[in-house]
């Protein structure tokens, strides 16, 4: 919905009203923050036509209905914000989702003071700090953010499309960097890595749930509570892994993964900003539902499609 080029302001506001009605109040504010940070980046880089608060696409599928026989949904996607929302009766699926920020704070202008994705990172770091040395060693699958042991997209194929096997082997790419479940990775089979949460004490397990709750902020309150209960049921089947250092100033990546949820947090190198190495002010986060759970696929009937 590029307001200046594709739709009038009234249409943009109508789209935002659908998004606001679908998300939790705090989730809607998070989405707005991502849009505003994107707008701020456009101002900083002098690219307001392609980086602004409305530089997103909105797709509506099906006809909005409360009936389980008439599923529907919508997609909102663009730079640093992608949300999928699927409804079937009282069921709501809000994955996959992607939220990013470069930078992750606005320090001047209309939205000065806006911050995003700080809490997710702080909770992940707090969890890593709380682990025993042995647990930290198990969790830390690579010590460096760009480790020599990582297998790179196209690493051995010389860009030959017929030799691409990164869906199975890659652990680093120029776009997703350390993410395993980014764009074009729907239903990817990702091996469990790191330390098993069954070895955690009760306070550490609560931190896992707190992190997941923050990643699920877009969900309406009841849907989020139900999802957290589902995560609790599989808590001892959950794994936590970490890439990078875990000192106070270190950039890092972490993933929480179970049969019912997969969340990723990654500090990236600069794209529009100038940092060549990953830094804490460029952040990407992803939420996936494993086992064909994304886009409501697992609760659709047969070949049920939305148009």
Indicate where each model-derived feature is located:
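A cross-kingdom marker for long, charged
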Residues: 1-12, 16-307
């Amino acid at each position: 919905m590029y307001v200046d080029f594709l739709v009038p302001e009234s249409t943009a506001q109508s789209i935002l009203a659908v998004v606001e009605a679908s998300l939790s109040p705090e989730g809607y504010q998070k989405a707005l923050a991502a849009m505003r940070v994107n707008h701020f980046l456009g101002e900083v880089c002098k690219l307001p036509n392609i980086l602004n608060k409305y530089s997103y696409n909105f797709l509506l599928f099906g006809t909005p209905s409360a009936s389980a026989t008439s599923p529907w949904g919508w997609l909102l996607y663009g730079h640093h914000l992608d949300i999928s929302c699927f409804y079937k009766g009282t069921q709501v699926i809000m994955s996959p989702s992607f939220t990013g920020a470069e930078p992750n704070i606005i320090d001047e202008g209309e939205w000065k003071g806006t911050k995003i994705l700080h809490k997710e990172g702080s909770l992940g770091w707090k969890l890593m700090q709380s682990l025993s040395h042995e647990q930290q060693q198990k969790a830390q699958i690579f010590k460096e953010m760009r480790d020599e042991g990582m297998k790179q997209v196209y690493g051995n194929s010389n860009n030959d499309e017929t030799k691409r096997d990164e869906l199975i082997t890659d652990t680093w790419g120029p776009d997703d960097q350390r993410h395993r479940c980014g764009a074009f990775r729907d239903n990817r089979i990702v091996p469990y890595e790191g330390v098993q949460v069954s070895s955690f004490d009760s306070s550490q397990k609560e931190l896992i749930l707190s992190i997941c709750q923050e990643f699920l902020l877009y969900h309406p309150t009841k849907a989020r509570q139900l999802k957290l209960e589902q995560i609790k049921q599989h808590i001892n089947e959950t794994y936590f892994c970490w890439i990078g250092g875990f000192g106070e100033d270190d950039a890092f990546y972490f993933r929480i993964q179970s049969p019912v949820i997969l969340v990723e947090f990654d500090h990236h190198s600069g794209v529009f900003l100038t940092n060549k190495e990953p830094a804490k002010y460029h952040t990407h986060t992803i939420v996936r539902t494993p086992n064909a759970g994304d886009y409501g696929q697992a609760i659709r009937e047969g070949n049920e499609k939305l148009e």
